[in-house]
Amino acid sequence: MSDILKKIELYKREEIAAAKAAVSLADLKAMQAGQSAPRGFYKALVAQRDAGNFGLIAEIKKASPSKGLIRPDFDPPALAKAYEAGGAACLSVLTDTPSFQGAPEFLTTARDACALPALRKDFMFETYQVHEARAWGADCILLIMASLTDDEAERLQDEAFSLGMDVLVEVHDAEEMERALKLSSPLIGINNRNLRTFEVSLTVSETLASMVPADRLLIGESGIFTHADCKRLQAVDISTFLVGESLMRKDDVTAATRALLFGEAAIAAE
């Protein structure tokens, strides 16, 4: 595990302990009962793929450790509606506060504002967090293989499945990919960002894509800024993408989403 992930795990463990003291598992389960059923994160992405379209997981992200504040004018419900209008298939919402200035209410309010399934984007270490995610309305959780053992990943995955949620398993190298493929989740995300150096390269996705069998849905993450980037990854059978920063920096998020998915020329021709 990188030094960055070790530091994150330290504060997450403290956060989880404090959360458990404040909100019991029974309370979380009661909150889950008041939520609408999971909307089908994987199903929404497969529908786009099967229709021959690019599938977009559009990210609602206020800030990041490497870039600092990304969007000062930050309105999660408005952003969710803008992404939906632009053709996104799903949302990804940051709930981690120390590193990303995220919050649980960003997830809840964004999901409530639209019909899209939503991913809780956070660093998951304990099954309690999975129950938090469902209580807040999440339809999917993220598992970062670089921060988890195989047993931990499987335990978190199975807990999410028991709640009707989907699981996005994130990898950055061949060893993590081999480990991810031992899990049963069909959603595999390739993070093009090195979490040790923050360097980003689409060649990471291009290199690892060939390891993945056809029964998994590959998602390209990080470093995707243009329709040309999407086309480049399509050449290695990646047609689903998680994109945040490049869209968050645009004034017209709906137009930027459409341009990413369909290309500037297609938008201009409408």
Curated annotation (Swiss-Prot):
GO molecular function: indole-3-glycerol-phosphate synthase activity; phosphoribosylanthranilate isomerase activity
Keywords on record: Amino-acid biosynthesis, Aromatic amino acid biosynthesis, Decarboxylase, Lyase, Tryptophan biosynthesis
Signal peptide: none
Superkingdom, taxonomy of origin: Bacteria
Family matches, as Gene3D superfamilies: Aldolase class I
UniProt pathway: Amino-acid biosynthesis; L-tryptophan biosynthesis; L-tryptophan from chorismate: step 4/5
EC number(s) reported in the record: 4.1.1.48
Family note: Belongs to the TrpC family.
PANTHER family: INDOLE-3-GLYCEROL-PHOSPHATE SYNTHASE (PTHR22854:SF2), TRYPTOPHAN BIOSYNTHESIS PROTEIN (PTHR22854)
HAMAP family named among the record's database cross-references: IGPS_B
Protein name: Indole-3-glycerol phosphate synthase
Lineage: Bacteria, Pseudomonadati, Pseudomonadota, Alphaproteobacteria, Hyphomicrobiales
